[in-house]
């Protein structure tokens, strides 16, 4: 029996090598059950033999029973050993399962740690890049700080430059000045608002732009003027994000920041993005400041200008009218800022062919400027020139001629005193030369009839354009000698003005190359205004620059070519 059992065990051991773990566990359980049964059976037999042994006397038969009992005991010991080994195998199997499970958990953890390690490496690389960019930005800001400190030291020098050059410098800043309610935007009209009156308008609304935003605004001007939009845009976005975290979205400072970012987008010709930001800013300002606040008027005007740039004059007109209503209500109907808004509205109507309304708005603006700023204010000449261009488009040549002559006469009187027989404006010299053509020699000096213009420094770009337009009008009337006189005066004055500007800028470069480079960058950036031909002062902003070629249709032209009526955003040099 024992031999057979051993054989079975060996057979089982041979088969174990080919069994799976689950099969081994199952077979082991069966073996345990079999061994338990054998153990119980052997115990029963042993008990029976022991009972029999008690009843027998000591003889040969009792010895046989005792020998059988000993064999049964040995078998029980082997069964106990087999059971113990089987239980050890079961415990070992459970342990192996636990180890395998733990191994799988550790493998999953290793994979997760590898992924986290890779993520941390990527984050570290990104952080290092951001740190490098931040260090570069810090270095740039340090340079910008030094530059601004230097510019502040030159403030007295800047205050001493000519009035017309001041206007040109202001015009280069205008695209970003419109973001604040104290300089409500009018790119394209070029009617600059004085800071004192603008600040008063802002205070009337009970909201004042924080100094930190003005500093940021100036910094954005510098970056945008250099074409460094990759710096200006993130700077605006970061400031906007910080403001929204600290003050919430519906806060006037957030609206101001939205306006700044909108203008940067506008300079990049991203008109759709700019319009979305301006609409958001408008909603915030109406909610926080009220619908009749000057800042609301500024935002409405900015939005109207933006629509105008996209050719959406019909959509822009009601916005411009609402801005006009607010300014009339807050500032009064005869305030210069109202005239500025009237100029914008006139330009929108002119692009839609509403000439009666254009005349009304320009005439009203002209009356305000003459009353409040005086007849010698540059805005008076500019508005007259705009009104004259409107007359030209309608074929009202006589009215346009009258306005052109008024501009030239006033410019002459401002420089040389009242007009008399010995002191005549250039258009009178031109008409006299036309009447006396053939009698006057070709070698007549320019100074005899046009030298007065060389000293005209007040608003020479407007005068230059007026000379050209009146010359074109003379040419249409067949007054070729008079036309040539005015055109020659304009050409020579322009050349002299450019020479003066060149000399001045050479001197500036020698004194401060960095400042001059910055000035050039600002001038090249300013695509948001339309300028007349540049004069000695570098040019002044106006709502439109129109030269008429004297054709029968009365079409506007520039340098003999057809010029489209432009919304502010294009510049003629």
Swiss-Prot record:
Effect of residue 524 to A/D: No effect on motor function
Modified positions (Phosphoserine) in chain numbering: 162, 460, 521, 524
Main location: other
GO cellular component terms attached to this protein's record: cytoplasm; cytoplasmic vesicle; cytosol; growth cone; kinesin complex; membrane; microtubule
GO biological processes: cell adhesion; microtubule-based movement; stress granule disassembly
Protein's name according to its UniProt entry: Kinesin light chain 1
Coiled-coil ranges per UniProt: 27-156
Residue list for modification Phosphotyrosine: 449
UniProt similarity note: Belongs to the kinesin light chain family.
